[in-house]
């Protein structure tokens, strides 16, 4: 018999309908479900695909460097980072007439170009790159790494080079290598780069391979290290009038604890960051020697977990059985990894703007907005994925006998309490927050704004004060000039930090009021509701009172037929599907809040946010409508402008988003009838009926249609907001 797609599933390959194609694509990466899979081959396939992933990442970053070197304006941007627009790449489009060519010819380019809002220019400048040749060199090196990764991927699928199952399950060795190798050594290497290349470059010294061994990053070299006088490395830091990239006002220190920002670049001190990475390297190099391997020293994770039985018996048998449960479940491990990575990605979003690490990025407002939004959306998708794989773990990998009465089993045992508490929190937040917004909205509508209910966020203001913000007049901890906390750090990092916190030209601890109080609670509602749906989906994945045998139906069943009505919409997949809508909704509020607060901060009219953010019409009129006006004006009788492409994308995003509903609000019967009518017409149309196909066309399954609808909804939602964000910010600030 001829081999048909998918080769990994004989059952699907013999399916006579178009279901074969869609189910084949959907399960192509679900290696566990493939016909002749073994646990060992499963691990080997995933391992090899990781190298493929790395190859794609290196190729993509290489492309960024290459296109900027070839078509960008890196060298002229360096001369004046605050006024030259960084170019991502050139645009060639046969549709462009003269007005379009003129509109998109910017940043000193000869023809139409795209402006870079990714922050790569600022990053490359900060880490010591200075010429197009540097960029080309980096691109070639990454291309080499990409090729190497592809070879490694192929190599580890060859019989001689396939790692064994025991190698994959050796958790202690993997942890040691990842902690000390991946984090420790790479952080140490990065410290080395900052000290030997980036810091000299910031002081006007050009260090490359040809003079790398001749230029001492510190006048006394390794002397202070070897004689134990480490504090010398912090002496004579760059002065407050240092011009970045020049020797003017530069010092000689390489590892400092200044705190705050470089006055000219508005970014963290490079010498502080080098110090930070050295500390991280030190910690992780030690951490990478903690676990017991062939040498018989260090901790055994299994022993640690088995020994950790909480006193008083309040948590049953504690962590017994967890080691094997986690070590034998790829989904559990992936869930943990995604949860961690999701949190880290969101932290990146929060810290990139509040503590900007790259020179001049804080003054590139569009880039700041784009990076915050990008990282928050990515974090949302990654975190929902964590719960999805947690649910798959419960269905495919969880063994009740192995986990009897341990902390994991006890989570399942009291899931009703967990879910109902989350439900209560969500209801409380939702009704109270919406109640306040609606009340305020009505008061504004009736012309009595003084009757609004405006609550000052005193606890949050108290926390800001404890960290040194003096605006609110709380005399506490770091805002109390005669307290022990204040005095302890005065000679170290504190002056720089306090200046930064109390200066209103950055995003550190922005002044907050009633509008912030309300939107924080709206975001809390979104977070708790998303969590409720995800946690319920995972904890009910094996079964519920309604459907005790749910685990036998797998991860993504649509319903258990008409015989058990009411079993639709309760698979673990459905929980993930519903949670993504709430996740998008929540991150919408998060990014609206961040963007509006910052637009008013950058324009110097913070009172607009403070006054308009306390009622619904304020958000709709003064944020969304007011800032989308430029987008709606992308094309007009006077020709086009550089925002036209975003205006088009704004419209296109709405179209994609709306298309999602076509899949979300109609079911199979309608489409099956339509398909059969179209097939009938096709077979009776001359010429068209020369084209025939083997598979009988059938409508998408309920689950598939939901996935397609969700994908369109998500992509359209994000496209629309991306266009709005970039156009409304760049239209104001360039």
From Swiss-Prot:
Swiss-Prot/TrEMBL catalytic activity: reduced [plastocyanin] + hnu + oxidized [2Fe-2S]-[ferredoxin] = oxidized [plastocyanin] + reduced [2Fe-2S]-[ferredoxin]
EC number: 1.97.1.12
Binding residues for chlorophyll a B3: 662, 670
Subunit structure, interactors included: The PsaA/B heterodimer binds the P700 chlorophyll special pair and subsequent electron acceptors. PSI consists of a core antenna complex that captures photons, and an electron transfer chain that converts photonic excitation into a charge separation. The eukaryotic PSI reaction center is composed of at least 11 subunits.
Record-stated family: Belongs to the PsaA/PsaB family.
Alphabetized UniProt keyword annotations: 4Fe-4S, Chlorophyll, Chloroplast, Chromophore, Electron transport, Iron, Iron-sulfur, Magnesium, Membrane, Metal-binding, Oxidoreductase, Photosynthesis, Photosystem I, Plastid, Thylakoid, Transmembrane, Transmembrane helix, Transport
Membrane topology: Multi-pass membrane protein
Residues reported in the UniProt entry to bind chlorophyll a B1: 654
Protein role: PsaA and PsaB bind P700, the primary electron donor of photosystem I (PSI), as well as the electron acceptors A0, A1 and FX. PSI is a plastocyanin-ferredoxin oxidoreductase, converting photonic excitation into a charge separation, which transfers an electron from the donor P700 chlorophyll pair to the spectroscopically characterized acceptors A0, A1, FX, FA and FB in turn. Oxidized P700 is reduced on the lumenal side of the thylakoid membrane by plastocyanin.
Assigned GO CC terms: chloroplast thylakoid membrane; photosystem I
NCBIfam families in alphabetical order: psaB
Domain of life: Eukaryota
Binding note for cofactor: P700 is a chlorophyll a/chlorophyll a' dimer, A0 is one or more chlorophyll a, A1 is one or both phylloquinones and FX is a shared 4Fe-4S iron-sulfur center.
SUPFAM superfamilies, sorted: Photosystem I subunits PsaA/PsaB
UniProt-recorded Gene Ontology molecular function terms: 4 iron, 4 sulfur cluster binding; chlorophyll binding; electron transfer activity; magnesium ion binding; oxidoreductase activity
Regions crossing the membrane: 46-69, 135-158, 175-199, 273-291, 330-353, 369-395, 417-439, 517-535, 575-596, 643-665, 707-727
Binding site for phylloquinone: 671
Organism of this sequence: Hordeum vulgare (Barley)
Compartments (UniProt record): Plastid, Chloroplast thylakoid membrane
Protein name: Photosystem I P700 chlorophyll a apoprotein A2
Residues annotated for [4Fe-4S] cluster binding in this entry: 559, 568
GO biological process: photosynthesis
Gene encoding the protein: psaB
